Amino acid sequence: MPILSKYSNEQVEQIVDQLIDVLTQHNAPVDLSLMCLGNSITHILKEHVPTGKRQAVTENFAKALAQSVK
């Protein structure tokens, strides 16, 4: 069953393209890119997810990430 999102593919793709553009402008190698994106994810989780839900959200995110690179 496909995952349904409340966001359009176009909206997601535009934001991803902008993130990739910034990394490209800085000639960021893979390790630096992953560090920056990881730090951004950590910031989003700490600032926008209630403490009691962070562990579950983090685990779900990690599972989704692992599935997306298989």
Curated annotation (Swiss-Prot):
Superkingdom, taxonomy of origin: Bacteria
NCBIfam families: PRK13689.1 (NF010242)
UniProt similarity note: Belongs to the UPF0352 family.
Protein name: UPF0352 protein PSHAa1818
Species of origin: Pseudoalteromonas translucida (strain TAC 125)
Lineage: Bacteria, Pseudomonadati, Pseudomonadota, Gammaproteobacteria, Alteromonadales
